Structure formats: C-alpha cells, structure tokens
C-alpha cells in the first residue's frame, strides 16, 4: 500500500446467522475486543435497549427514537437498527474502563487522521454493501415528531486506508475486511448523517 497508509489489526466478527440486524452491536464487539475487553456480540446485544414499532387500528405507526434505543430486535431479520448515541451508551455500560464518544460531521478523512492513525478504530454509520439509502418506514416518535427510517442503514469499523481506498471490517454476511472507494463510502457515510463512535481507553490521549 502507499507510503504513510496504515491499517489496524482488528479481529473480524460476522453478524451472519446470529444477529441478522445487529451490525452496530457486532461492530462494537470488534472494537471492544480490539481493546482487550472480550465480549461476545450476542452478550452485547442482550444488553442493548430495544423497543418495537407498533401500528394502531387506523394503520398509523408509532415507534422509538433510534438515538435512544435499538428499533426492533437485532436477533431478528426484521429489526431496524440504532444510531451512534445508543452504541456509545452500550459501550459505557459494558466496558467502564473505556471512554466512548459520539462524533458528528467529521469527514472519514478526519476520523482516519485523528483516530485510526493513532491506533483507534472507529465505528461509522453507512449502508449495507454501499447501496444507496432511501426513505423507509415512517413512524411517530414519543415527541410527536415524524421519523423516517433510512433504508440499508449499516455500521462498520473503519480500520485504515489501502491504495487510496478505505479499509473497513464489515460484519454483514461474513464480508470480512473490505476496501471501499473513498468517494463512495464518504457519500454513504454522509447519507447516514455523518455519525461515528470512537472508543479509547481512559487517558489514551494526553
């Protein structure tokens, strides 16, 4: 690979056959294992706060805020998913020796430079197989606001850069370590609200 490019050595975990919609949890488990906090993805998923969406008689849909809980169940194929703050909380609750922080509006380039290059893998929200997202199920949040689920929502671990492409650990379908065109992944990450979670041992950065 090109000079100055690095890829972190993160052991791969697949969500296939165990957590069909648990990409966020399986990605988080890869990061926790990287920091020697050994945990099975299924054990982590058991501790994930989750809530189902429901329909009333008129067909109106009500559901939780994916910034607060996992929507549905990661153990099922019809689970939806959750956003960065839920995983940040999950890491706080299960690995108190680690510090986790949700980051918004950083570019992947910034995450790579500020964290990956310093030995810190980053959880990023993107799309399954780099597909485009599209508006999915619509429901009313507890706040009364209307929320539209972004189809193909996914979470992977950004671990490096190789030959000018991003390197990620992709829990989907046993995909393993993948390299993705930078512009493509930048776009998909952007389409999911440019959200990420960094996890570091306390006192790791001066």
Task: For each feature predicted by the language model, list its residue ranges.
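Short acidic/glycine-rich loop or secondary-structure boundary segments that cap or lie
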Residues: 110-111, 132-134
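Noncatalytic regulatory segments and standalone regulatory/sensor domains
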Residues: 136-150, 156-206
């Amino acid at each position: 690979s090109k000079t100055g490019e690095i890829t972190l050595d993160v052991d791969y975990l697949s969500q296939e056959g165990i957590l069909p919609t648990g990409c966020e949890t399986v990605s988080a488990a890869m990061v926790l294992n990287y920091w020697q906090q050994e945990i099975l993805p299924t054990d982590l998923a058991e501790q994930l706060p989750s809530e189902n969406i429901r329909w009333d008689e008129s067909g109106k849909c009500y559901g939780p805020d994916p910034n607060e809980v996992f929507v549905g169940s990661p153990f099922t194929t019809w689970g939806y998913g959750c956003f960065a703050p839920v995983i940040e909380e999950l890491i706080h609750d299960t690995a108190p020796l680690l510090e986790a922080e949700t980051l918004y509006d950083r570019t992947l380039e910034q995450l790579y430079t500020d964290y990956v290059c310093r030995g810190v893998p980053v959880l990023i929200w993107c799309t399954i197989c780099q597909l485009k997202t599209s508006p999915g199920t619509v429901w009313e949040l507890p706040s009364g606001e209307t929320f539209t689920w972004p189809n193909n929502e996914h979470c992977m671990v950004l671990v490096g850069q190789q030959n000018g492409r991003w390197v990620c650990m992709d829990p989907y379908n046993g995909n393993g370590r993948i390299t993705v065109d930078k512009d493509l992944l930048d776009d998909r990450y952007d389409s999911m609200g440019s959200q990420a979670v960094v996890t570091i041992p306390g006192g790791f950065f001066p």
